[in-house]
A protein has these predicted regions:
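Short, solvent-exposed loop/turn segments that connect beta-strands within catalytic domains
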Residues: 31-33, 46-49, 480-483, 524
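Long, contiguous C-terminal flanking segments immediately downstream of a protein's structured core
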Residues: 2-6, 14, 20-22, 78, ...
Length: 553
């Protein structure tokens, strides 16, 4: 071995002592934002001088898969998530105490001077200059934050935290922290997380998103913390078999956020995929947004969690919602999802009305999100808000908007009329099968039983229906018409939207083919467009005293 080779070997050994395989590191080059990764190789690369570190980057933005010139040096998660860098371009992190002191005490020790990053531009005629902004009360806030002993909420995102630091130091300096955000840091494993939790006796909420932790079931499970009630592990590349171990790590967890992971099923790693999820007895909120769930039968494996009140499934790949218990006592504690109050299903692939009808069977459901599904698409979908409200009788909130009693009543009446209008020639059995709540709504709103005749809808009284007049107010906001007063007009319930356009043409001289009509409901913040010329005023739920808005295309 030559002298140069001996020197390289010594340097390589020193580098290996400083950088261990699996260690979390961050790039000191921040031009592209924070870059985190795991060390997969430390040593010499054939054909290149010096010591190199092979890093598998979390972002996937590397140069190769660990193979250079036909030689594999390390394995990567992605096809091009690996690259070689020099050791001096990497940071191995700081202790939690150092990060806290650097952020909070440093800010409180600054002089009361304008913030360099906050300014406004002057309005001078010759040239603009930067006028510094001084925040009123900023010094007081920073002074209070600088008192680490009373700090309750600490945010250390991408601060390079890799360890708790010497035992007892954090507890002495910042014992009151209740919420800690460690998103995008360099903690290597759950043992280090446990040390942090042990140092912070008041800690209840912990954000660990954008981390990479090994999960391994041990003979004696690691108790990370019995005090933590809320944990976020968003964008950590987790599968459910890893998450399932958390019930041993965090026995009293109530809120668990797992957004943007790799969860496609609820197989726990020990049992077959056919079993229900066990444990997690205290879990109330589970956020699984932006994962890879496709089969509703997988979601049903969560249905025995006794305390689960809110389940977020936005941005998955679900095509159908089902509920197994369609009969019996809805108050039974043995029913699936017995405690579930909120279910968010936005941005999925739900396209069938049976999914909406299934939601009506959930025993406690009050809040549902169905936006951005094929069924509810405002251009191609068939589900409007009034239909969704009518088909789910227990809801008090839909797509983030409260359902007031007036809106529910009007939606249900409008829905019944819509069914009567569109299914005149259908049998009673066919209608009830397609619209499970129709008969119940008919009774709630006191529609006469003689609407059925020989198993079909009785239209014998359609003439009296057509002659049922009421007054509506038409407001014209079309720019081409100019300013004009609103007009109140008496119209029969059987007036179609197409005929209403003819009426508006005679009143405001705006051709019907250039009109766009809206129905203004006091319980809806946004006017509802009247698109179907064949629908009647009764079908769309327009009654006495309502307002029609006329605009131009």
């Amino acid at each position: 071995m030559t002298g140069g080779e001996v020197a390289d070997a010594r340097v390589c050994e020193i580098a290996r002592q400083q950088l261990k395989l699996g260690q979390r590191v961050s790039s000191l080059n921040t031009e592209k934002g924070p870059q985190l990764g795991s060390v997969k190789f430390v040593g010499i690369v054939n054909g290149f001088k010096g010591i190199w570190v092979g890093v598998d980057w979390d972002s996937g933005q590397g140069r190769h898969n660990g193979v250079v010139d036909g030689v594999r040096y390390f394995d990567t998660v992605g096809e091009k998530s690996g690259s070689f860098v020099r050791p001096h371009t990497l940071s191995t992190g700081v202790s939690l105490l150092d990060a806290l002191t650097s952020k909070y005490r440093a800010s409180s020790n600054r002089k009361d001077e304008p913030d360099e990053e906050m300014y406004v531009l002057s309005t001078g005629k010759k040239r603009q200059t930067k006028v510094p902004v001084l925040l009123v009360g900023k010094k007081q806030v920073e002074d209070r934050q600088g008192q680490l002993g009373i700090l309750r909420l600490a945010a250390l995102t991408y601060a390079g935290v890799c360890c708790a630091g010497p035992a007892g130091h954090i507890r002495d300096v910042a014992p009151s922290i209740e919420e800690l955000d460690l998103t995008g840091n360099l903690l290597p494993d759950w043992h280090e997380v446990k040390r942090i939790c042990d140092e912070l006796p008041a800690l209840r909420i912990l954000e660990l998103s954008c981390s990479r932790f090994p999960f391994a079931a041990a003979a004696k499970p690691l108790l990370v913390s019995s005090n933590l009630t809320g944990v976020a592990l968003n964008h950590c590349g987790l599968t459910w078999s890893q998450v399932d171990i958390l019930k041993h790590y965090l026995p009293n967890i109530q809120d668990l956020s797992l957004i943007g992971n790799c969860i496609s099923n609820f197989k726990d790693g020990n049992e077959d995929a056919g079993g229900f999820v066990q444990g997690l007895q205290t879990l109330r909120l589970l956020n699984l947004d932006d994962n890879y769930l496709e089969d509703w039968q997988e979601v049903m494996k969560l249905s025995k969690l006794p305390s689960l009140a809110k389940l977020c499934l936005n941005g998955n790949r679900l095509t159908l919602v089902e509920y197994l218990a369609r009969s019996g006592d809805r108050n039974s504690t043995s029913l699936p999802f017995v405690s579930l109050l909120c279910l968010y299903l936005g941005r999925n692939n739900l396209a069938d009305w049976s999914s909406v009808d299934a939601l009506d069977w959930f025993p406690s459901l009050q809040d549902v999100r169905l936006s951005d599904n094929p069924l509810t698409d405002h251009k191609t979908g068939t589900a409007t808000r009034f239909m969704l409200i009518a088909r789910m009788g227990s809801l008090s909130c839909l797509n983030g908007s409260l359902i007031k009693p007036r809106e529910r009543r009007d939606s249900e009446i409008r829905y019944v009329r819509h069914v009567l209008q569109t299914m005149r020639t259908q049998s009673k059995e066919r209608i009830i099968k397609s619209h499970p709540r129709f008969e119940k709504l008919r009774m709630i709103h006191d529609l006469p039983e003689d609407i059925w005749s020989s198993g079909y809808i009785n239209t014998a009284n359609s003439d009296s229906f057509a002659n049922n007049f009421f007054a509506v107010t038409i407001e014209c906001v079309a720019a081409g018409v100019g300013e004009c007063a609103s007009i109140t007009k008496k119209l029969p319930l059987a007036t179609t939207i197409g005929k209403l356009k003819v009426v508006c043409e005679s009143l405001f001289k705006l051709p019907s083919n250039q009109q766009r009509l809206y129905f203004k409901d006091q319980d809806s913040p946004i006017p509802i467009e009247l698109k179907d010329d064949l629908e009647t005023l009764a079908d769309v739920g327009i009654g006495p005293g309502r307002i029609i808005i006329l605009d131009e295309i």
